């Protein structure tokens, strides 16, 4: 829960907040704002490539340097946190354990929070981050807000209003089964089931998912893949040099529209949808050309209700750090 926004923030020393993704880690020293309503102050933001470091401890040790006064750290990361504090995730290049980090870095406290749970705590900071309004009214109704974004995996969380003290519900929506609507999508899912018993949503809606969809399309058309990375597929689609690359992004956006619509109905997210993550800002043009909105609204009689739900694309940027910091400050205040 979030404390009264007009109340003075607790007197908390500076701490470190990190947003840990499958590709990058963003880290900052954070100073608490004077009131709970004010955004935390990010004093020194740095970005690290995961592939360049053998562990998160190495990254944080490099960042901390001579900052011996910093004793606490909060980490936003994808995955499911077990009761012993370790994180179950398929998207990080190394294990993540707060006990190990605390020992390695000689810190007093290391806290973990789901990455999209942290992002949900930054909802009040998102207006300035809006890149694109995709559908729905400019002003949303009061109600739960859905945050969702494909990156190395697919993150999702729900922000629920609660008389000025909102509740954030983290989810593992990316691990739910990938639904199919069209005949082509059914063929793609059937092909993906050839070597697995479960096709999760993030097997299509993620950076690696773009490559999975592309390879499946190539297999269905008996064509050898010409590209070996999501970036190469996106560049070929943007250049108009490869029909299958363009079709891959079309399928990706269609899946996204359907799944966002499904989640809005499941969670009653009448307060709107924020699309984040590291991929979608790079796919603005394919998203605008796609059937995203049509698929989002294609829910039978419920399509009319979905017309009143705004869907916005935001630039994730430093919001993961801000959200992690807000989560930590809220934890200290309650």
From Swiss-Prot:
Gene Ontology BP terms: glycolytic process
An MF annotation (GO) of this entry: glucokinase activity
CDD domains tied to this protein: ASKHA_NBD_GLK
Top-rank lineage group of the source organism: Bacteria
A Pfam family matched in the record: Glucokinase
Keywords assigned: ATP-binding, Kinase, Nucleotide-binding, Transferase
InterPro entries assigned to the protein according to its UniProt record, in alphabetical order: ATPase_NBD, Bacterial_glucokinase, Glucokinase
Residue positions binding ATP: 18-23
GO annotation, cellular component aspect: cytosol
Family: Belongs to the bacterial glucokinase family.
Protein name in the entry: Glucokinase-like protein XF_1460
């Amino acid at each position: 829960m979030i404390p009264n926004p007009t109340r003075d923030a607790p007197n908390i020393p500076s701490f470190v907040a990190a947003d840990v993704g499958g590709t990058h880690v963003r880290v900052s020293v954070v100073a608490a704002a004077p009131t709970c309503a004010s955004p935390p102050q990010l004093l020194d933001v740095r970005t690290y490539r995961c592939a360049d470091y053998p562990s998160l401890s190495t990254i944080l040790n490099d960042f901390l340097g001579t900052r011996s006064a910093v004793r606490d750290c909060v980490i936003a990361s994808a995955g499911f946190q077990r009761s012993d504090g370790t994180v179950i995730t398929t998207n990080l290049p190394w294990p993540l354990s707060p006990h190990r980090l605390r020992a390695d870095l000689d810190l007093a406290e290391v806290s973990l929070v789901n990455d999209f749970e942290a992002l949900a705590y930054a909802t009040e900071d998102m207006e300035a981050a809006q890149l694109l309004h995709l559908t729905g009214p400019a002003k949303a109704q009061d109600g739960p807000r859905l945050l969702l974004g494909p990156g190395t995996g697919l993150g999702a969380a729900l922000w629920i209003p609660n008389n000025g003290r909102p509740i954030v519900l983290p989810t593992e929506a990316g691990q739910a089964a990938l639904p199919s609507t069209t005949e082509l999508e059914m063929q793609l899912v059937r092909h993906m089931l050839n070597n697995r018993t479960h096709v999760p949503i993030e097997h299509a809606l993620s950076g690696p998912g773009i490559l999975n969809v592309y390879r499946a399309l190539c297999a269905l058309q008996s064509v050898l893949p010409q590209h070996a990375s999501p970036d190469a597929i996106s560049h070929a689609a943007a250049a108009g040099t490869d029909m299958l690359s363009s079709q891959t992004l079309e399928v990706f956006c269609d899946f996204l529209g359907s799944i966002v619509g499904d989640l809005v109905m499941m969670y009653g997210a009448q307060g709107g949808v924020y699309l984040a993550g590291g991929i979608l800002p790079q796919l603005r043009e394919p998203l605008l050309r796609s059937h995203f909105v049509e698929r989002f609204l294609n829910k039978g009689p419920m399509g009319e209700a979905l017309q009143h739900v705004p869907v916005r694309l935001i630039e994730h940027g430093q919001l993961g750090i801000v959200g992690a910091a807000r989560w930590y400050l809220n934890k200290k205040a309650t």
